[in-house]
Amino acid sequence: MKKYGEYKDSGFDWIGKIPAQWDNLRLRFVCELRNGYTPSKDNSDYWEDGTIPWYRMEDIRDTGRKLQEAKQYITEEAVKGGGLFDAGSFILATTATIGEHALLIVDSLANQQFTNLKIRKSLSNILSRDYFFYYLFVIDDYCKATTKTSTFPAVSMELLKNCHIVFPSFCEQTAIAAYLDTHCAKIDNLISIQQKRIALLQELKQSVITHAVTKGLNPNVEMKQSGVEWIGDVPKHWKVMPLKFTGTFGNGLTYSPKDVVDNGILVLRSSNIQNSSLSFEDNVYVSKVSRDLLVNKGDIIICSRNGSAALVGKSAFVDKELNATFGAFMMRYIPNIEKKYGFYLFQTAIGQYKGYFSTTTINQLTKTTIDEIKVPLAMAEEQAAIASYLDHKCATIDTSISNAQHQIDLLQEYKQSLITEVVTGKRKVTDN
C-alpha cells in the first residue's frame, strides 16, 4: 500500500495522522446546514399533484446514495421560506437511523430525519463536491460513534458542526474521487451479485412455503377448486376459511417516551423482526404492561403499520419464552392450530394478499382486513408434518442466504475501509 512521504498529527484521534501538506477545516466553515421537515399531512394542497421530490430514508435504502426520483412528492405550497435544498448539496441522517448520506441530483427537500449540507460558495474551488461525497462516509462513522444509543437517537449538532474535514489540493481531490468511483463501482457490482442471489433465494423460500401450505406434501392427493384465485386448487379433504377461524389477532401497546426505561419489559417493534426471525439489537423497554399484552412462546408478531409498505406484514415466530410485549404498530397472532404451521400459513396468506391487491400502497393491516383473508387449512395431523418439512427446507435456504449476506457484509466493510484510508491520507492513490 503506497503512502505519503511525510505525515502530521491531525489533532483528532478519530482521524489520526494526515499527510503533511493536507489542510483541515471544521464542518461549520465548510457547509451551510439546514434541517429537513415534513409538510402537514392534513393539508392536501401540500401533497396532491406534487412535483418536488421529498426524500425519506426509504429513498436511500431503495435507490442509493445519489437521489433524483423520490417515493413521495410535495407541491410548491409546502415549501417553507428557506426554499429547496439545492441540487449538488447533500443530506445526512442525523436522527433515528444515524449516519447515512446521499447526494441530491435535483432541487428537492427531505424529512426531519435529515440535515442538508451545502458546500459554501467561497470554498467551491477549494473543496471538491465529489471528494466531499466520499468524505461523508467518514462523517457517517463519526456520527454513529458520537451518538448515544437511545429510543430516539439524534446527532449533536454542535459536535457535527465541529467535525473536521481533511483534504489535499483540489486537483488531488479530483483524482481521489475518480479512483474511488472506479473501485467502489467494482465493489458495488460484487455486492449487487450477492443481493440478487439473496432475492432469488428468498423467492425460492416463499415458493416452497406457498406450495406446502396450499398443496400439501402428497403429490398424488386428489385436488379440488378452492374458490380463491391466489390459492388455486387444494387437497380435496382440506378446508378453506377466513384467517379469523385459525386464531386471534390483537393490536399492540401504545406508549410514550416517558414510559421508556433502561431495563424492563421488551417492546417488540418492526426493527425487531429481521428475516422472519426476532432480532434483539435495537431494543426499547417499558416498566409495566397488562398481562394480556405479554408475549408467549408460539405467538406470531406482525408489523401492521409502517411508513414503508414493503415492511408491512412481515412477521416472526416467538420460539422461546420472553419478558416482552409488542408495540402499537404491531399485531399479535395467537394460532389455535399447530403454531409453527400457523406461522407459515400467515406468511403465505399475507404475502399473496399484498401481491394480489397492491405492492406499494398498503401501509397498514387492520384486524378487520386480516380476519377476512381466506386461507387453505390442512387437517390437524398434517399440520405438524408440513411445519417440520418447512422448518428443514427453510433452514437450508436460510443458511445460503446467511452466507451471501456475510459476503455482502465483508464487501461493505472493505469499501468503508478503503474510502476511509484514502480520504484521510492513509493510502496514497495518486502519482504526484
Which functions belong to the PLM regions below?
Residues 1-15, 21, 167-221, 376-432:
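Amphipathic alpha-helical coiled-coil/heptad-repeat segments
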Residues 7-10, 94, 108-117, 148-174, ...:
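A short glycine-rich beta-alpha junction/loop motif
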Residues 7-37, 49, 63, 162, ...:
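Non-catalytic DNA-recognition/assembly elements of restriction-modification systems
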Residues 10-11, 28-43, 58-87, 244-256, ...:
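Sequence-specific dsDNA recognition surfaces
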Residues 35-39, 60, 140-141, 206, ...:
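Generic structural signal for secondary-structure transition and capping sites
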Residues 40-48, 147-149, 222-226, 256-263, ...:
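Short coil/turn segments at secondary-structure boundaries
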Residues 56-57, 73-137, 156, 269, ...:
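A short beta-sheet element
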Residues 136-140, 144, 188, 346, ...:
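Short amphipathic alpha-helical signal-transduction/dimerization elements
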